[in-house]
Amino acid sequence: VCSSDLANQWNNYRQSRLISEYESVVKDESRKGTINYEKEWERANAYNQSLLPSILPDSFAIAAASDKPGEEYMSCLNILTDEMMGYVEVPKINIKIPIFHTTSEEVLSKGAGHLEGSSLPVGGENTHSVISAHRGLPSASLFTDLDQLEDGDHFLIRVLDQTLCYEVDQIHIVEPENTSDLAVEPGQDLVTLLTCTPYAVNTKRLLVRGHRVPYEEETIEKEEKESPMSLYTNYLLWVVVGLAVTAVLIISLWQYDKRYKRKRKEKQAAAGGAPKDASDRKEEER
């Protein structure tokens, strides 16, 4: 249990670092000349428009099996050139997870993946973006608590220099091959968060859909909370840090004592071989 919680904390830390790096790049005034946000939005919107002939893209199955996603797709929203397009934040369950291109196993082991073939998460009419993440991994929490969301809750998609807010309006559990709930709906701006269910069984898919609403900080703040699991894992992290610091101190004191005794013996030898005390003899026997 301790090792899995520690791995979970490490992954949370790594995700936080990625998100912090992303935010620093977005907010860095000196980079505004090198990153044309308007152009990035235009490219992403053009990509989404290209998907519209197929309201329910057949490319879902193809994308899931493909090891070589399209170059145009991979280049969209890739301002850090690390395949991270933004991050999803769910205040009610206290998570912030990087969103990467594709839903490959490598991607899903470290964060959330955007389902290629669905709309890129930039909002707009006639769009339906699908964000997928694992649930119940021993090394990462990810979408483990997604089943706690209810109609009326909110989640955020932070991409480039924009924050898009979505209100949950539909929660379905479906068979893996059933993609009808992922269809684009005319005139709608939708995002679905997708994960496996039941917990640790994973034979079905949990789909939490939201429609775009105005972003109001007061509403989001009301939903924020620190869950008991977060308190537990944070406490555990401090326990582990405390044990590590204690171990370092013990090793440092042992090394200092060893060096002190060695220097004392050297001084005794230089002084003509003064008799060794019991502690010196014991040290030599070691």
Indicate residue ranges for each PLM-predicted region:
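Alpha-helical transmembrane segments
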Residues: 244-259
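N-terminal membrane-entry
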Residues: 231-241
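Cytoplasmic C-terminal tails of single-pass
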Residues: 261-286
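Solvent-exposed, non-transmembrane regions of membrane-associated and secreted proteins
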Residues: 1-233, 257-268
